[in-house]
């Protein structure tokens, strides 16, 4: 970025904003890049401003018990704010003085006042000077206030971010990420745009007093009649505003419903296409859109009346002001025109400026209070460390994630003390639940010496991660002692990648040591992965490391922890996403050898790792089940150890199954604790009345607001083999979605009834721990792509201790002053739809011809405008050519037909004309505005429908290129613009344009010479606008792109908050945040400056125009005072309206860019059109000159497919047309009714093949089903032949019936029959409404297993003959897994089944096998052939998979399989029971 020329600019350059000319010139000629933008002035840097405000806020906190943020802001910015306010006031005062001079000029034409005729020219010069002074005062004042608002926003941005990095985990669990984003976006943006109008809270009243004083001098008491109308109008606007708030809340709920299901559909578009649900989803979303539009129209009509009231009030304000005075005294034309000018200014002050200023102050003060409350929230407490202590000691440690029991009792009592009942007694009431204190950790004792390794294992949710958080200081101990040095390194369970290069992620601000770095990279098996990248370890990773596999992210996260030289290393399940071989290599080379001299705490569930640990801690329900060595475990807990060691392949099980086994084993062998009581009754959905209460973790008080506290009711264990931790404790830091369950919502409010229909928010702590909400789906997505198997060979490291090379200090990375725009662009990449710098005429044409009525309404608007102009010219003609006969009262009539005095006797004639014209124009304006707003909203409806259809029918390659968030932005942000802003902005622009053009026409009609000055003025305006828009739209685009890194960095920091605190890298991340802020500031500041450059020059052009008009009017004296008054009044009206019209035109062009983006999505080519094109190409290649006649009988009968036979010939599959082939020239066949197992390593193409069957990808070759080729029928017909269970479970917001049958094809009896068949009937029956019960938030009230059963039921209902299953048992508990196997055997007995599974034992049910390796397919007719030593499968399977399959084959033949859960002890009905 270049240095800003503002700092060296002269006073004249700053006054006229000439320093922005180079950037405007470059933007007009070339496309602007980030490097072209000037740096923000040094006074606007985030470091400087945040330090300034932070210093004042600390001073405020130190000096007062109740600190006020507004006082800190006042001390920082008040004097400049006052200075620009005075400039703004002086500029506004000139508007009040202008009508006085206008009256004097008109009076100079009075035949009886010839003395002032000679000074008319001087009065004209004075009037023009007032316009010049106003222009020179107003624009610097507005820019200065915008500048101060920007600085306040930057300072508070930084203050909020710094506070966020200090928040305690308890606070993070109480606030949502949406609240933080709201603080940094919606609210704070009001400072930038609103501060310029804030001064009108005092300027407008002073302006009104001054104007009323001047009007009193003209009209006496009559002046207050017009003011009274304006006050009534303001009250009317306030009433409409209240009504709009009511509709806004209702409408917001409807919009939320639509966006929720739209988001769900976009995130699960693969499932939607696989189920052929495009039309069904389109109908559901459009029905919600219809309900939303009803509210939108009502709200728009109210906003229309509020906005148009300003325009419509002009006639009547003047009329009511003049009428009483005229009836009594008569009036001269000078007073009429002066009154009109005064009323224009008065109307703006009363109806626009003052209400807006009041609203701005109200919003700003409320927002400052919100930020103030946020800044006073609890911060996490840094533990007191002993730097000389290198081990770890914990003595009788107990901890709660929530506030302590006694502390909460005191809070509730305190709240009740403040609220008295009518008889003066205090009441503290509790629920009748059996409340038991539930600490997350209880009486933990540890003593680990330097160099020892502690392995922590235990049941799901037992507190393993919580123990690490306790050591880090994130969890505060309520009892006990913790001792360690404080030099800690941490690797989180969920891999966290910050935006930056691979090297920066590993070094993470620690001083670079090449030997240590290379050793760590080698030990973490990253060498081979890094060499595959073009930039190697300088490769820039995007948000969350989206370009990496899950395994690569896990290894980088581990390398970061290992690279840091610390005394204590906390490794929270670092191997969860790695295959067995890679895990073994990293554990040996890194944890056991490289870190041999360090104290390590490893969370793991593998027996081999437990054996090699110096000590073992087994946790169960927050308590220590066992602490000691592995040999002590065998002697002290023989039942437990022998049970686990009885599993020959325990370490080869998935992490989920190992956790399930541990949980079940601990549950069976744990010693009964007297302090823990359990209800052995089996849980059932029939206890719906207790459902909400059992999962609420609060004290219920009848008089106090409810607080979240650390006590819950113990609930019974479920029948399944996994832990019941979700019911036993309020918060599990283990991401439960990985264990096959979805946590229930945690609400801040306690309700007496069930919580089924309610939505939950995702807290920041949920975001950090990836607890299920919207994040659970992303976790499942992640796990589907993370099983990357490293092929790196074992590495023998040197015995030298890399940590002996201790550096002088762990300093942060040097961050240069220059911003690396390219790195930022790559790190914070966001899908931006490329659109032209200026909205093209084609976009306007497409938009206004979108709806037949819209073009007709525009023509109608023009006709109404012509009628209004004609009516105005007619009135002027009457007043000019038909003098009123005043007879009795001696109306003065000069020989040259001057109409000077209107008396009471002649008043009624003028009154009827004026009122008649006013009523006509008012009615016409209403008829013009309402149809326009109505049809524009209809156009928005059409655009939404077309865009939705286009997205739902777009090929999958489109969704691979575009992010889901970018697509959702079109349906949220852009559709909101089309609904809310564009209709009224277009109405305002058209109305203002007609006012300006109409005034110019009338002025030119009265004085033709003025028309000669109008033409060049309009031409210059049009050219200047086009010149400015080229640059301004590019700056707005850059500003929008620059805003994304700010919020991305906030979310990224929150996700890795525990990591960056453990590494003490808060300052480093604050610096990165300030970099992003400075980048955005540079773009936004340039936009503000160039906008002011443009508006000032527009004012200058029309100041010149007014000068010309004034002197032409004064010098051509033959027309008299009436004509001069009309010309000057209208010219002044042009000046006051023009700036508004210009802003509206710019806003319209800016908002039309949303229309351009929507059209881009509408123009996306659909799957059907692409397939039709491919089919034509295939036919033309086969017979280029032949006549192609479609055979309607290719689809042989309505029962197709009848058998399910599949034949694949020479199939080649690509993700993109010009990409590499994933599968190439593969051929095989599947007989009807066969069960085929699809095997291969991760990334070999198993899911790709299933997608090719569904025609989701670019395919060439032949696929036949029962003799019918894929290219002989439509996509929908082809896909309906398949029943699909995808990797990612899709439950959308809707009823059970809609989720099972969204097309409404089946009767209830058939749905119930299938539900019973798959084991869902007893589940659905427990919910209120049963099939009509509404599932929300991805069906969070259902377990993962039940969601999978829903997908199974859909396939059964589809009556398909070919079933495709892509890892259906992923993350399932053993019970649900057994149910799915049973349904597959029974419900799909006569179907062809293609099963892709990572659970090798699932393959025992298959009759044939297909193995994919290196893009080729090998067929095996039996399991024995598959396991043959000569089989190519030996090269495709990892050794762990071979062990599983071998064990499964022999155990199934020779002995009963080890029971993980008591499946045989449960009846068939119990299998179908649910645990939520």
Curated annotation (Swiss-Prot):
InterPro entries for the chain: AAA+_ATPase, ABC1_TM_dom, ABC1_TM_sf, ABC_transporter-like_ATP-bd, ABC_transporter-like_CS, ABC_transporter_C-like, CFTR/ABCC7, CFTR1_ATP-bd_dom1
Organism of this sequence: Rattus norvegicus
Pfam families, sorted: ABC_membrane, ABC_tran, CFTR_R
Ranges spanned by the short sequence motif PDZ-binding, renumbered to the chain: 1474-1476
E.C. number: 5.6.1.6
Gene Ontology MF annotations: 14-3-3 protein binding; ABC-type transporter activity; ATP binding; ATP hydrolysis activity; ATPase-coupled transmembrane transporter activity; bicarbonate transmembrane transporter activity; chloride channel activity; chloride channel inhibitor activity
Designated gene of the protein: Cftr
Residues exposed to the Cytoplasmic side: 1-77, 147-195, 244-298, 359-853, 935-985, 1030-1090, 1147-1476
Gene3D superfamilies: ABC transporter type 1, transmembrane domain (1.20.1560.10), P-loop containing nucleotide triphosphate hydrolases (3.40.50.300)
UniProt protein name: Cystic fibrosis transmembrane conductance regulator
């Amino acid at each position: 970025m270049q240095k800003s020329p503002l700092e060296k600019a002269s006073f004249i350059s700053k006054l006229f904003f000439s320093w922005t000319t180079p950037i405007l010139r470059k933007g007009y000629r070339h496309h602007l890049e980030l490097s072209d933008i000037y740096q923000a002035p040094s006074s606007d840097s985030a470091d400087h401003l945040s330090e300034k405000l932070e210093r004042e806020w600390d001073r405020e906190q130190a000096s007062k018990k109740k600190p006020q943020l507004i006082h800190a802001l006042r001390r920082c910015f008040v004097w400049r704010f006052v200075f620009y306010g005075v400039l703004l006031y002086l500029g506004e005062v000139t508007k009040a003085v202008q009508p006085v001079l206008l009256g004097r000029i008109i009076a100079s034409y009075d035949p009886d006042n010839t003395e002032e005729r000679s000074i008319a020219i001087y009065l004209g010069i004075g009037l023009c000077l007032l316009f010049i002074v106003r222009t020179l005062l107003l624009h610097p004042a507005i820019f200065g206030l915008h500048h101060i608002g920007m600085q306040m926003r930057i300072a508070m941005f930084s203050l909020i971010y710094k506070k966020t990095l200090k928040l305690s985990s308890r606070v993070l669990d109480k606030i949502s990420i949406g609240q933080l984003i709201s603080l940094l976006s919606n609210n704070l943006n009001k400072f930038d745009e609103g501060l310029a109008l804030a001064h009108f809270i005092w300027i407008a009243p002073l302006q009104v007093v001054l104007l009323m004083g001047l009007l009193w001098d003209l009209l006496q008491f009559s002046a207050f009649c017009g003011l009274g109308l304006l006050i009534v109008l303001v009250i009317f606007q306030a009433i409409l505003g209240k009504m709009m708030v009511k509709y806004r809340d209702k409408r917001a709920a409807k919009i939320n419903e639509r966006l929720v299901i739209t988001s769900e559909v976009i995130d699960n578009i693969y499932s939607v296409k696989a189920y052929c649900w495009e039309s069904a989803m389109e109908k559901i979303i459009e029905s919600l859109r219809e309900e939303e539009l009803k509210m939108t129209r009502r709200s728009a009509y109210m906003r229309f009346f509020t906005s148009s009231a300003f325009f419509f009030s002009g006639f009547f304000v003047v009329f009511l002001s003049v009428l009483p005075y005229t009836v009594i005294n008569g009036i001269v034309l000078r007073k009429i025109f002066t009154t009109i000018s005064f009323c224009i200014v008065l109307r703006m002050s009363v109806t626009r400026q003052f209400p807006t200023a009041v609203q701005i102050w109200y919003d700003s003060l409320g927002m400052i209070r919100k930020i103030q409350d946020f800044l006073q929230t609890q911060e996490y407490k840094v533990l007191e460390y002993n730097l000389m202590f290198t081990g770890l000691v914990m003595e009788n440690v107990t901890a709660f994630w929530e506030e302590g029991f006694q502390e909460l009792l005191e809070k509730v009592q305190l709240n009740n003390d403040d609220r008295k009942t009518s008889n003066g007694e205090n009441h503290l009431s509790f629920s009748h639940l059996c409340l038991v204190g539930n600490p997350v950790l209880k009486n933990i004792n540890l003593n680990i010496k330097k160099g020892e390794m502690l392995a922590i294992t235990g049941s799901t949710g037992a507190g393993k991660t919580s123990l690490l958080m306790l050591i880090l200081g994130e969890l505060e101990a309520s009892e006990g002692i913790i001792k360690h040095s404080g030099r800690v390194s941490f690797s989180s369970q969920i891999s966290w990648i910050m935006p930056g290069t691979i090297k920066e992620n590993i070094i993470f601000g620690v001083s670079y040591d090449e030997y240590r770095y290379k050793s760590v990279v080698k030990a973490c098996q990253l060498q081979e992965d890094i060499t595959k990248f073009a930039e190697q370890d300088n490769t820039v990773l995007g948000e969350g490391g989206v370009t990496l596999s899950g395994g690569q992210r896990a290894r980088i996260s581990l390398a970061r922890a290992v690279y840091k030289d610390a005394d204590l290393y906390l490794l929270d399940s670092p191997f969860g996403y790695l295959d067995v071989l890679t895990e073994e290599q990293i554990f040996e080379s890194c944890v056991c050898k490289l870190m041999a001299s360090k104290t390590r705490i490893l969370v793991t569930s593998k027996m081999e790792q437990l054996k090699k640990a110096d000590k073992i801690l087994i946790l169960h329900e927050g308590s220590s089940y066992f602490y000691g060595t592995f040999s002590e475990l065998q002697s002290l807990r023989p039942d437990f150890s022998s049970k686990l060691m009885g599993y020959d392949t325990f370490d080869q099980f998935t992490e989920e199954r190992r956790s399930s086994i541990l949980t079940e084993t601990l549950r069976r062998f744990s010693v009964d604790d007297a302090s823990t009581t359990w209800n052995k009754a089996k849980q059932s959905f029939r206890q719906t009345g207790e459902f909400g209460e059992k999962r609420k973790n609060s004290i219920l008080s009848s008089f106090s607001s409810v607080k979240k506290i650390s006590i819950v009711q113990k609930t019974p264990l479920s029948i399944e083999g996994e832990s019941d931790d979700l019911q036993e404790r309020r918060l599990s830091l283990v991401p439960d979605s990985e264990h096959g369950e979805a946590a229930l919502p945690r609400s801040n409010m306690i309700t007496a009834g069930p919580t089924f229909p309610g939505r939950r928010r995702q807290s920041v702590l949920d975001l950090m721990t990836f607890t299920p909400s919207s994040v659970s789906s992303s976790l499942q997505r992640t796990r589907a792509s993370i099983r990357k198997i490293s092929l790196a060979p074992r590495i023998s490291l040197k015995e030298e201790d890399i940590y002996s090379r201790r550096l002088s200090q762990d300093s942060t990375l040097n961050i240069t002053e220059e911003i690396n725009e390219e790195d930022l662009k790559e790190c914070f990449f966001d899908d931006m739809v490329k659109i032209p710098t200026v909205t093209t005429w084609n976009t306007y044409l497409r938009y206004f011809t979108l709806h037949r009525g819209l073009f007709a309404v525009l023509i109608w608007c023009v006709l109404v405008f012509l009628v209004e102009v004609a009516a105005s010219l007619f009135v002027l003609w009457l007043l000019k050519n038909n003098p009123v006969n005043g007879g009795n009262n001696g109306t003065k009539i000069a020989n040259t037909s001057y109409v000077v005095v209107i008396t009471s006797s002649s008043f009624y004639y003028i009154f009827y004309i004026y009122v008649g014209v006013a009523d006509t124009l008012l009615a016409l304006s209403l008829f013009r505005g309402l149809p326009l707003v109505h049809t524009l909203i209809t156009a928005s409806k059409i655009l939404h429908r077309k865009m939705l259809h286009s997205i739902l029918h777009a090929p999958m390659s489109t969704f691979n290129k575009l992010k889901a968030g970018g697509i959702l932005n079109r349906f949220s942000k852009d559709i909101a613009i089309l609904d809310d802003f564009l209709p009224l902005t277009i109405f305002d622009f058209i109305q203002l344009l007609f006012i300006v053009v109409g005034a110019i026409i009338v002025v030119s009609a009265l004085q033709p010479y003025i028309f000669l000055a109008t033409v060049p003025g309009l031409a210059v305006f049009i050219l200047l606008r086009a010149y400015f828009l080229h640059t301004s739209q590019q700056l707005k685009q850059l500003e929008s792109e620059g805003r994304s890194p700010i919020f991305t960095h906030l979310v990224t920091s929150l996700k890795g908050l525990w990591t960056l605190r453990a590494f003490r890298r808060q300052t480093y991340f604050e610096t990165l945040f300030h970099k992003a802020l400075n980048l955005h500031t540079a773009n936004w500041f340039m936009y503000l400056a160039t906008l002011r450059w443009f508006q000032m020059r527009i004012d200058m052009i029309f100041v010149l125009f007014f000068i010309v008009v004034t002197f032409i009017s004064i010098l051509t004296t033959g027309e008299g005072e009436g004509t001069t008054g009309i010309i000057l009044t209208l010219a002044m009206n042009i000046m006051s309206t023009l700036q508004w019209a210009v802003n509206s035109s710019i806003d319209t062009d800016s908002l039309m860019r949303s229309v351009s983006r929507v059209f881009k999505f509408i123009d996306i080519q659909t799957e059907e059109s692409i397939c039709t094109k491919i089919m034509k190409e295939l036919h033309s290649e086969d017979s280029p000159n032949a006549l192609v006649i479609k055979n309607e009988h290719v689809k042989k009968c309505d029962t197709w497919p009848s058998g399910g036979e599949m034949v694949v010939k020479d199939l080649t599959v690509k993700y993109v047309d010009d990409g590499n082939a994933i599968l190439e020239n593969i051929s095989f066949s599947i007989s009807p009714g066969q069960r085929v197992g699809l095997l291969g390593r991760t990334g070999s193409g198993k899911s790709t093949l299933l997608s090719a069957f569904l025609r989701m990808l670019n395919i060439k070759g032949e696929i036949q089903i029962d003799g019918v080729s894929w290219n002989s029928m439509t996509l929908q017909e082809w896909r309906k032949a398949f029943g699909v269970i995808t990797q990612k479970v899709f439950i959308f917001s809707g009823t059970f019936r809609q989720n099972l049958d969204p097309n409404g094809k089946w009767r209830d009896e058939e749905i119930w029959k299938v539900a019973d068949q798959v084991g869902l009937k007893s589940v659905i029956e427990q919910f209120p409404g049963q099939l009509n019960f509404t599932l929300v938030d991805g069906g969070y009230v259902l377990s993962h297993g039940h969601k999978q059963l829903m997908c199974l039921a859909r396939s059964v209902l589809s009556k398909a003959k070919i079933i495709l299953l892509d890892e259906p048992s992923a993350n399932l508990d053993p019970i649900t897994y057994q149910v799915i196997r049973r349904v597959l055997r029974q419900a799909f007995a006569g179907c062809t089944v293609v099963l892709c599974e990572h659970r090798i034992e699932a393959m025992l049910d298959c009759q044939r096998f297909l193995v994919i390796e290196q893009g080729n397919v090998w067929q095996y007719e039996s399991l024995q052939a598959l396991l043959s030593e000569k089989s190519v499968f030996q090269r495709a399977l990892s050794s762990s998979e071979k062990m599983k399959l071998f064990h499964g084959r022999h155990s199934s033949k020779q002995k009963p399989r080890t029971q993980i859960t008591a499946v045989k002890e449960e009846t068939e009905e119990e299998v179908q029971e649910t645990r939520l």
